[in-house]
Amino acid sequence: GSHRSHGEILAKGLSSIYKLDDVELYDIMKEFLGGRILSVVEGREEVKGNIKELAIDFLLYGALAEVFARTTGFNEGLGGSMHAFFIPFGIFPNNAIVGGAAPVALGAALYKRANKKKGIVIANFGDGACGRGPVLESFNMSGMDQIRQLWGETDNGNNPGLPILFNIFDNFYGMGGQTMGETMAFGMAARLGAGFNPEQMHAERVNGYDPLAVIDAVTRKKDLLLRGEGPALLDVVTYRVSGHSASDASTYRSEEELEEWKKADPVRAYKEKLIIGGVASSDEFDAIDESIVRRMTKICRLAVDDELSPRMDLEKDPDVIARIMFSNEHRRTMEEGREPDVLMPKADNPRVKSLALKSRWAFDENGKILPKAKTFGLRDALFESIIDKFYEDPTLIAYGEDNRDWGGAYAVYRG
């Protein structure tokens, strides 16, 4: 998600609700936080017994309770408005770092590629983040030549790129600076793709005020990512009507500019298109609007109810954050039943063999200090623990210069 990603949280959540069957949905709601969120909304749905309707209430309430710092929020009120996430619906953690979604999504895509997992990953961020190092480094790493030229074939017999779509909300502003013609050099964000691989990241500039244009573009990008042709980039042109924050008086732009963009309101324009096209009637849209008001009124009242939605009491329970932060569990592997993909048995690794000859005690049998070359050192201990994990957990990967031929500044990774 982007820096402030409430809309993305809801969009991804609603998509998951639509795709999951009722049994899966209910199990997710029942098991998450021991059913704490579910217990607040269950029985209050407008259509009793309708799991999809219940799940929508669950999503809205979990997100809003998080914004209001309630223990019934998705992250028990500790994430707040900018850091909410819900992994069961595929909503990855957000952060306060501008452009921080790019490397998080890159890591998720790298996981999918390295572990031959299905699906794609989408990183959402604004045009104001396109000058940030994490974003530009993510562009570069996502298109590294080695991914498609050296990493070897997957089960499909091809060498796929990373399944990641960098989705830029190009709303012309980063806080108060206008990216086009002021704070950036690219003019149009889609041009960035030309700097990172021969395919120019399949970059495309799209009218973000036209939902059908966005759907078409994302569908095409999804198809090419699933074919292994990633990464991809979309420059979705939109506009930020509101200020950056509540204290933003928008003094950096004119009233005329704001009014012109408001006249082009995409929600109203799309509604009119659907009515003119005979897809839906004005009465149907009125009914939808009324149902949204009823639902949100209900959810807001629940989220601010101190009894149903309490805040965390750190005076009564000072250890609660520690319990949330640390699982106190030990998982030897993140994927049970799958064998690690290794080049040789661990016992045949040359460095493992050489370490077996080293003393794990600093003195010989006569009490004399052994030479450092003959003793098991700190770098050896680090290497041993790392390589042990690679033979336990098939999802673990290592990358970076330290893992290349030289083995790092202290030879921890050598061998």
Locate the predicted segments by residue:
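Long, amphipathic alpha-helical stalk/connector segments used for oligomerization, subunit docking
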Residues: 223-228, 233-235
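Alpha-helical scaffold elements adjacent to nucleotide-binding pockets in ATP/GTP-utilizing enzyme cores
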Residues: 137-138, 217-220, 415
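Short glycine-rich or small-residue beta-strand-to-loop segments that form or flank ligand, phosphate
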Residues: 1, 122-126, 204-207, 396-402
